[in-house]
């Protein structure tokens, strides 16, 4: 038998992994037993008689114990220099030579004995250093704290009442492929409420409902049912409303087969194209006498009202930029929980580009100087956000302040809307009873069938939406009472004591105590009075409108000069309180009822601003607020007690100085976070006090508000303290009734959200309004402190998408370290060992650099963006809407700590993910070994000659054909994400096989190859979430029998490098070491990948696939450097070293 040389090329680092023989386990046990006993003198004599050698004969084992020679970058084998006895050792198993170079440490020789060379230490992929373990535990601890805080702290209460309906749907089958190519995939329906709508004829105003991501067309039923019932029970009996142009609403809804629009830009465009054709068809129905039942004197409809939920709101805005959009067919858009500001995820390039096209179009349209140049001049957009309970789409993304001016749209939160006053989750915003009532009534209020557009003019529509959706206390709120005509003639006795002295407060603890109708007259200070006077009134009783006979009415009155024989018949309502006295004064009065602001009732028994199903209905408070300039043309405010029997109820009315009731606390955010903020309301205070804190803008921070108890000297409070926190832009208000403690969170300046068109970020801030009983002569102490644990939960919704990017930052740095150690020492260290080395230097340096980069960009940014958008003035404007897109999405230096925080969390996540991958591969390896069958009659010698099937792969021709077929499918039918998923599965199987061999035969070559394949598998797994959404969309299309070839993602080059690399690894071919300058290319590619993932990964996550794809292309090239650049070399790239295995070793 020929003896083979121990220096065979099979031990090269670039060779295939060593295959374990059948007796490998027996040898390992024997070796372990022998190593457990000390060496005897006889053993030393045997070693001395034997010639020095570091290899063991095949008679004892087939395993080569010699350290493998390294292959340089040119593919030649380098012989290791002889060892030096005095060279110092290295922790990585290296020794220093005389010329200062590091090389692998070999066994030293002594003159007395020759010790056999030891096997390089086995590097377990499960092992983790103490420092890496601590970092991982800290990171996972932070992540658990964030998740725990998000579900336990700073939670908004749920206050939605259940809604009920009796739905039916009529499918419009005539809207078929003759109208649109997408009719075979999508369907159009007309909603009808049972027992109310008697047929399917259209006779009202068209409204189109667009469902959101994976939404159902049946989601229209709560709002459509409320609209049908409200018209049937109320409006059709209101003659004034019918004369004003109100008609019932015809709700159309679209069945998108629960399409996934959030993950696929082409699907979004397809839906917009289909809906434009649907709008054209809907408008044509009103021209067909067979299906329309309308007054022939009314104009035919030329536009529809659009109601969109979630991504349906984005589809609605997309319709206006599509080529098939019919001009002026949409002029009113109401969206609910729609992410207008940015895509919810950035995994698809077409989605990101579509968002950019939509938002650029809208901004460009509203920046035009003249209305005729603005194609969206008549369009109004109202975005309604659910608030903190919406955990599907961050409500920060619902902001349209960066898209439309306040003359054409606004953003409002459901907690702001009167009589709603609660946050809502992503689905509850559709069925919440009190909310759907407001939406239905608001739509009816903008309808006017006397116009072809079926709606009122734009300015009037905006006025209506602000009335229904805003509190009425905003600075833009318009007061209707001063502009109205006098409705009431009030006659009072000149000798009456009902006139309140100027400067005094009117306080009524009960109504009707006088036993007769009584008017309390409060003189109005003249305009321009010092202190900027304002009038405020609060009561728990509903204020009457003109002509109503309730308990209380508030009027603004002017004295009518007395003229003989003057007729008073022009007043619809007259109240004579003079009791027949000759000395009387007549007042012409306007009702304040149109300007009443509803506030949640705050008593000692209330807990929330709302009431739930089964609870007693709570009557809200009525509040009036006017500046003196608004009512300066009147002389008196008349508070009329119309009830004549003692009735529970209070009234507090006063004129107060604006300077006394409003204050601004200029405190830095750092001081507020460190020391908190304290202030007090004095005993002699107005009923309403307001405190503005401009530094409270960030949506990442949460606070706790505490209010001390007030002493009323034995009397009961008229009402419990009521607190309102609000932002001026967007319109977000939250109410706290019976307030003693309150949790404060807001949706202000948020990460990755573009700045508003006005750019007035520094002027805005969080404000607090306090309604307190002014009759209690005691001060109130208020304290605002930061809630750091509650603030952690706010990071979840704002930064959950970083897990699509930042882990790649960690993985790329670890891979870079693994390749650098491998090119230097020939050892491809395990992933966790590479992570430990990175934690000692690379990761801290990178985080420090990224922090300084963020700080420098924030300093260099123009101060508050000096050039803003100016409307209709012709000035050029520059606004950077992308400066929040990078890194952590904010340039505020206060939040720079988030960079290392996110990084340490990702270190923990990557560590856990690595152990999960190790567990998966080991389990699969165990399963594979269980199904492997070795016949018992095969002898040991035959087992030695048998090459295991671990890396027996199909022939090169078959693999090339398989790859070609897969790429052909990508080109024609399937998206490249499908091929990438296949590549991940193949890489998993390769890693499992490499793990089996490395565990059965512990050698450097096997360990290197396993660690290499495992790290590539980890990299591919972190890229997989970016590709899975598009794959899910493709599978969904197949599930709904939409067999049209996928319309995007067919670029073969986007996946070919991954396929080639994975196929190369299936041959067991280890990547060669790069001894020349080419090794720096790998390092630079991985370094660039890490930087790109950290800086651009969140906003442009889809590009990470392309970056990793380029890395795979480079690694495939490096694999091929062991051969010449020829067709034979390309074949060898696929075939590995199968030929070597067939030829065996050469002597």
Curated annotation (Swiss-Prot):
Listed Basic and acidic residues bias regions: 28-49
EC top class named in words: hydrolase
SUPFAM superfamilies for this protein: alpha/beta-Hydrolases
Membrane topology annotation: Multi-pass membrane protein
Main location: endoplasmic reticulum
Alphabetical keyword list: Endoplasmic reticulum, Glycoprotein, Hydrolase, Membrane, Protein transport, Transmembrane, Transmembrane helix, Transport
Active site: 310
Spans traversing the lipid bilayer: 127-147, 795-815, 843-863, 893-913, 918-938, 965-985, 1015-1035, 1052-1072, 1084-1104
Glycosylation sites: 23, 74, 865, 873, 1011
Residue ranges, annotated region (Disordered): 1-94
Subcellular location(s) per record: Endoplasmic reticulum membrane
Protein family according to the UniProt entry: Belongs to the GPI inositol-deacylase family.
Protein name per Swiss-Prot or TrEMBL: GPI inositol-deacylase
Gene, per the UniProt record: BST1
């Amino acid at each position: 038998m020929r003896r083979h040389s121990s220096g065979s090329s099979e031990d090269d680092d670039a060779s295939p992994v060593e295959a374990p023989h059948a007796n490998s386990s027996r040898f390992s046990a024997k070796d372990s037993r022998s190593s457990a006993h000390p060496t005897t003198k006889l053993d030393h004599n045997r070693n001395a008689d034997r010639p020095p050698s570091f290899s063991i004969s095949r008679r004892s084992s087939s395993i080569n114990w010699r350290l493998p020679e390294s292959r340089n970058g040119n593919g030649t084998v380098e012989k290791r220099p002889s060892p030096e006895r005095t060279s110092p050792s290295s922790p990585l198993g290296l020794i220093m030579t005389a010329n200062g170079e590091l090389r692998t440490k070999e066994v030293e020789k002594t003159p007395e004995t020759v010790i056999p060379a030891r096997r390089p230490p086995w590097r377990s992929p499960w092992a983790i250093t103490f420092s890496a373990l601590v970092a991982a535990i800290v990171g996972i601890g932070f992540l658990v704290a964030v998740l725990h805080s998000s579900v336990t702290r700073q939670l908004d209460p749920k206050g939605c009442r259940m809604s009920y309906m009796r739905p039916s749907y009529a499918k419009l089958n005539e809207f078929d492929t003759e109208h649109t190519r997408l009719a075979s995939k999508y369907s159009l329906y007309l909603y009808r409420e049972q027992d109310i709508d008697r047929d399917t004829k259209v006779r009202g105003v068209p409204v189109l409902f667009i469902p959101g991501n994976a939404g159902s067309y049946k989601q229209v039923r709560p709002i459509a049912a409320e609209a049908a019932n409200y018209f049937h029970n109320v409006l059709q009996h209101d003659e004034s409303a019918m004369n004003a142009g109100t008609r019932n609403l015809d709700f159309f809804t679209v069945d998108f087969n629960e399409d996934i629009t959030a993950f696929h830009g082409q699907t979004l465009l397809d839906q917009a194209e289909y809906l434009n054709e649907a709008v054209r068809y809907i408008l044509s129905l009103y021209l067909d006498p067979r299906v329309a039942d309308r007054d022939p004197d009314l104009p035919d409809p030329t536009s529809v009202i659009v109601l969109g939920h979630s991504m349906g709101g984005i589809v609605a805005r997309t319709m206006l930029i599509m080529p098939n959009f019919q001009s002026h067919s949409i002029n009113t858009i109401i969206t609910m929980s729609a992410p207008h500001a940015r895509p919810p995820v950035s995994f698809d390039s077409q989605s990101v580009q579509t968002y950019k096209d939509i938002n650029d179009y809208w901004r460009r349209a509203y920046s035009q100087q003249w209305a005729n140049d603005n194609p969206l001049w008549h369009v109004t957009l109202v975005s309604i956000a659910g608030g903190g309970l919406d955990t599907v789409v961050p409500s920060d993304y619902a902001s349209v302040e960066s898209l439309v001016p306040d003359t054409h749209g606004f953003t409002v939160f459901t907690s702001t809307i009167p009589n709603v006053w609660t946050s809502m989750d992503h689905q509850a915003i559709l069925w919440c009873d009190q909310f759907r009532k407001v939406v239905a009534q608001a739509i009816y209020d903008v309808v006017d069938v006397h116009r072809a557009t079926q709606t009122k003019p734009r300015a009037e529509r905006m006025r209506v939406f602000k009335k229904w959706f805003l509190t009425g206390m905003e600075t833009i709120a318009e007061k209707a009472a001063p502009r109205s005509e006098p409705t009431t003639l009030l006659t009072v006795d000149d000798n009456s004591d009902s006139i309140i002295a100027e400067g005094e407060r009117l306080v009524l603890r009960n109504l009707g105590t006088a036993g007769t109708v009584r008017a309390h007259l409060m003189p109005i200070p003249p305009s321009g009075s010092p202190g900027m006077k304002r009038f405020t009134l609060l009561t728990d009783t509903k204020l009457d409108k003109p002509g109503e006979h309730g308990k209380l009415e508030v009027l603004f009155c002017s004295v009518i000069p007395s003229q003989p024989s003057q007729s008073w018949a022009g007043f619809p309502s007259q109240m004579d309180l003079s009791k027949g006295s000759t000395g009387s004064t007549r007042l012409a009065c306007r009702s304040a009822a149109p300007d009443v602001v509803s506030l949640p009732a705050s008593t000692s028994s209330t807990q929330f601003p709302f009431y739930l199903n089964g609870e007693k209905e709570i009557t809200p408070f009525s509040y009036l607020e006017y500046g003196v300039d608004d009512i300066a043309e009147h002389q008196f405010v008349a508070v009329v007690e119309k009830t004549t029997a003692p009735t529970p109820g209070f009234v507090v009315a006063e004129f107060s100085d604006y300077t006394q009731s409003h204050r601004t606390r200029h405190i830095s955010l750092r001081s507020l976070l460190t020391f908190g903020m304290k202030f007090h309301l004095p005993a002699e205070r107005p009923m309403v006090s307001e405190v503005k804190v401009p530094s409270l803008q960030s949506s990442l921070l949460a606070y706790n508000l505490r209010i001390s108890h007030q002493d009323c000297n034995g009397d009961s409070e008229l009402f419990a303290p009521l607190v309102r926190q609000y932002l001026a832009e967007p319109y977000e208000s939250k109410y706290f009734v019976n307030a003693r403690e309150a949790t404060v969170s807001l949706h202000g300046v948020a990460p990755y959200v573009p700045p508003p068109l006005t750019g007035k970020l520094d002027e805005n801030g969080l404000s607090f309004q306090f309604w307190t009983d002014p009759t209690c002569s005691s001060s109130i102490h208020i304290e605002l402190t930061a809630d750091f644990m509650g603030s952690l939960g706010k990071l979840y919704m704002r930064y959950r998408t970083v897990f699509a990017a930042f882990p790649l930052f960690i993985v790329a740095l670890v891979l870079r370290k693994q390749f650098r150690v491998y090119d230097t020492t020939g050892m491809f260290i395990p992933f966790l060992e590479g992570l430990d080395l990175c934690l000692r230097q690379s990761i801290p340096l990178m985080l420090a650099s990224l922090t300084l980069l963020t700080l420098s960009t924030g300093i260099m940014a123009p101060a508050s963006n000096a050039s803003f958008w100016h409307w209709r003035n012709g000035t050029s404007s520059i606004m950077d809407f992308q400066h929040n897109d990078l890194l952590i999405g904010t340039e505020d230096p206060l939040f720079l700590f988030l960079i290392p925080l996110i990084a340490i969390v990702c270190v923990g996540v990557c560590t856990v993910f690595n152990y999960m991958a190790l567990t998966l591969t080991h389990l699969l390896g165990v399963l594979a070994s269980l199904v492997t069958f070795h016949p018992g009659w095969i002898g040991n010698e035959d087992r030695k000659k048998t090459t295991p099937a671990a890396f027996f792969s199909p022939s090169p021709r078959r693999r090339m054909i398989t790859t070609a077929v897969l790429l052909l499918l990508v080109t024609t039918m399937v998206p490249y994400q499908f091929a990438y998923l296949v590549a991940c599965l193949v890489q998993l199987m390769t890693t499992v096989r490499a793990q089996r061999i490395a565990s059965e035969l512990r050698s450097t070559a096997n360990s290197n190859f396993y660690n290499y394949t495992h790290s590539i598998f980890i990299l591919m797994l972190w890229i997989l979430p970016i590709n899975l959404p598009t794959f899910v969309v493709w599978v969904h299309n197949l599930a709904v029998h939409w067999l049209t070839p996928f319309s995007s993602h067919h670029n073969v080059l986007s996946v070919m490098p991954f396929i080639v690399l994975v196929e190369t690894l299936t041959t067991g071919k280890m990547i060669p070491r790069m001894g020349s300058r080419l090794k720096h290319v790998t390092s630079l590619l991985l370094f660039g990948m890490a930087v790109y993932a950290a800086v651009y990964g969140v906003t442009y996550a889809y590009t990470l696939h392309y970056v990793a794809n380029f890395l795979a292309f480079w690694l495939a090239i490096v694999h091929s450097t062991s051969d010449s650049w020829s067709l034979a070399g390309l074949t060898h790239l696929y075939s590995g070293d199968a030929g070597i295995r067939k030829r065996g070793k050469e002597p």
